[in-house]
Every structure is written in structure tokens, then in C-alpha cells.
Swiss-Prot record:
Organism classification: Bacteria, Pseudomonadati, Pseudomonadota, Gammaproteobacteria, Cellvibrionales
Organism: Saccharophagus degradans (strain 2-40 / ATCC 43961 / DSM 17024)
CDD domains: ABC_PstB_phosphate_transporter (cd03260)
Catalysed reactions listed for this entry: phosphate(out) + ATP + H2O = ADP + 2 phosphate(in) + H(+)
Assigned keywords, A-Z: ATP-binding, Cell inner membrane, Cell membrane, Membrane, Nucleotide-binding, Phosphate transport, Translocase, Transport
Function: Part of the ABC transporter complex PstSACB involved in phosphate import. Responsible for energy coupling to the transport system.
Matches recorded under SMART domains: AAA
Protein name in the entry: Phosphate import ATP-binding protein PstB
Gene: pstB
Gene3D superfamilies in UniProt: P-loop containing nucleotide triphosphate hydrolases
Compartments in which it is found: Cell inner membrane
Similarity comment: Belongs to the ABC transporter superfamily. Phosphate importer (TC 3.A.1.7) family.
Quaternary state and interactors: The complex is composed of two ATP-binding proteins (PstB), two transmembrane proteins (PstC and PstA) and a solute-binding protein (PstS).
GO biological process, one term: phosphate ion transmembrane transport
Binding residues annotated for ATP, in chain numbering: 78-85
């Protein structure tokens, strides 16, 4: 039985096990002494060790150890407020923009400490791009949306080079054929799904090594979502991708590995098929079978 078969069975059949009560969930959290499954891997692009995240005095993420493999898709799932988006933002230091946020522990990118005090975050964020929940094209033309990053980072010395980057990025984002005859039209005039693919093209244009996606399909219709999911599969051949999603079906469709977060703890990480068909932790099983959420 595949991961998607398991989720379809859960959706269509009556759950035999009772809904987990708050006290049961709390006891389950108390039992989390370490992440189960296979949190560490070979060929790691990111190495995360002992990461804690605080907002003021409130701790949001607890002691995460995780490797993110090169040229794979890892999906991060869990209930709302479980810390998955907070953790994702640690990977390109977007949490630096929040004054009360503090990150401790170690995060390395190809062995480089990304929290080194001497590190310039601008080139880091070029290497580790991000696509947000809501499409956010610049109030510029389609062409200028994609060209902006390469201009800022000095990646094109001639107009012809810039034209090539724009075309290549739009093709990789699966958008070129839809916009090639109107490149100077406003990016904000595109449909929601097209805007999100434009944002992906904008990210690709600066030649990142990693793409972070925070709920990239939550504001899109099913057809646009399907196009984004197809795109993720294609992009994973050349990029490392970490995606936060509330859709377990989406995680099952697009990812190689899945990480389950609960109340700031990384509960379980394993191959996606294993997580959805035979999870090792009772909290993971309870979540994917709909006993709480």
C-alpha cells in the first residue's frame, strides 16, 4: 500500500481508534526524548544540530537534529503552530528579521556555519531562496520581476545575458509559454497560480542551490496546485527543496522524505512512504490517521 493509498483509506473509512485527547497528546510529547526514524543522512546539504528557537521567552522549536539531503524534497508536516514554518525560516535566516527571535544550535550549508556572525546574509539568501505562502510578485513587469535578482547580484553584464536568464528561469518554472508574448505586462495581472510560478522563477533566476517553500499552494486552486507539484518534482533534479505543507496528500505526492513536527519537537523523519504507511511514533500515526490535527 502506498502513502497516498493510506491517506485515501483514512479519508474514506471510519477511524477505528478513538480521537486522541489533550492529556494523551501531552503524554506523547513528554515521551519525545529524541527524533525517531532516520533524521541523519549521507549527502547532506544542510546539517542541523541542537537547534532551538525562541520568541522572547517562549520556546518555539526544541533541540532539532536533522540532515536535509542534496537534490531531494523534504516535506515538513504537523498541526498548526507546531514550529515547522519557524524552523524552515532558520535555513536562510529569515528569522533575523524578527527582533524577538533567537536561534541557538548549529546549522551548516555544505559545511559552512550559516549563523557565523561574520556571514553576509545577502549571498546566503541567494543560495537559499524562498517561496512564500501567498504569491508576492513585485509591482513590476513580468520581465522585471525575474530580472531584478540577477541585476542586484551582478549576474548579467549584458542585456542579452539578462534576457537568457529571464527566459531560462520562466521555462524552468513552467511559465514561459504562457507569458512569452507579454513579458512587459504587470506581474500582478497574472492568475494566482501564475503569480506563484513567477515567484518561483524569480527565485530560480539568482541560481540558488536550495529552495524553501512555505505553504506554496495554500492560496491556489486544485489545477494551479497540480502545476506547482509537477514543477517541484522537476526542480528537485537540480535543487534541494524543503516544503512546509498542511496537506498530507501533497507531502506524499511531492517529497522523498517527510519530517513530522509536534509542539516544537521534531518527532519523526523518514522516507515519505515509510512515514505514511508505517510510522514509528504514536503521535505521527495519530496525526496522519486524523485522530488530532
Amino acid at each position: 500500500m502506498t502513502a497516498l493509498d493510506t491517506l485515501e483509506r483514512v479519508e474514506t473509512a471510519e477511524i477505528e481508534k478513538p480521537i486522541m485527547q489533550d492529556k494523551q497528546i501531552a503524554r506523547g510529547v513528554e515521551k519525545i526524548t529524541k527524533t525517531v526514524g532516520v533524521p541523519l543522512t549521507e549527502n547532506a546539504k544542510f546539517g542541523i544540530r541542537g537547534v532551538d528557537v525562541f520568541y522572547g521567552e517562549k520556546q518555539a522549536v526544541f533541540n532539532v537534529d536533522l540532515d536535509i539531503a542534496k537534490n531531494q524534497v523534504i516535506a515538513m508536516i504537523g498541526p498548526s503552530g507546531c514550529g515547522k514554518s519557524t524552523f524552515l525560516r532558520c535555513l536562510n535566516r529569515m528569522n533575523d528579521t524578527i527582533d524577538i527571535c533567537r536561534v541557538s544550535g548549529s546549522i551548516t550549508l555544505d559545511g559552512m556555519d550559516i549563523y557565523d556572525k561574520q556571514l553576509d546574509v545577502v549571498p546566503l539568501r541567494a543560495r537559499v531562496g524562498m517561496v512564500f505562502q501567498k504569491p508576492n510578485p513585485f509591482p513590476k513587469s513580468i520581465y522585471e520581476n525575474v530580472a531584478y535578482g540577477p541585476k542586484i547580484h551582478g549576474l548579467a553584464s549584458r542585456r542579452s545575458d539578462l534576457d537568457e536568464i529571464v527566459e531560462t528561469s520562466l521555462k524552468k518554472a513552467g511559465l514561459w509559454n504562457e507569458v512569452k508574448d507579454r513579458l512587459h505586462a504587470p506581474g500582478t495581472g497574472l492568475s494566482g497560480g501564475q503569480q506563484q510560478r513567477l515567484c518561483i522563477a524569480r527565485t530560480i533566476a539568482v541560481s540558488p542551490e536550495v529552495i524553501l517553500m512555505d505553504e506554496p499552494c495554500s492560496a491556489l486552486d486544485p489545477i494551479a496546485t497540480a502545476k506547482i507539484e509537477e514543477l517541484i518534482a522537476e526542480l528537485s533534479e537540480n535543487f534541494t527543496i524543503a516544503i512546509v505543507t498542511h496537506s498530507m496528500q501533497q507531502a506524499a505526492r511531492v517529497s522523498h522524505r517527510t519530517a513530522y513536527f509536534h509542539m516544537g519537537r521534531l518527532v519523526e523523519v523518514n522516507d515519505t512512504e515509510k512515514v505514511f504507511t508505517n510510522p514509528d511514533h504514536e503521535l505521527t500515526e495519530a496525526y496522519i490517521t486524523g485522530r488530532f490535527g
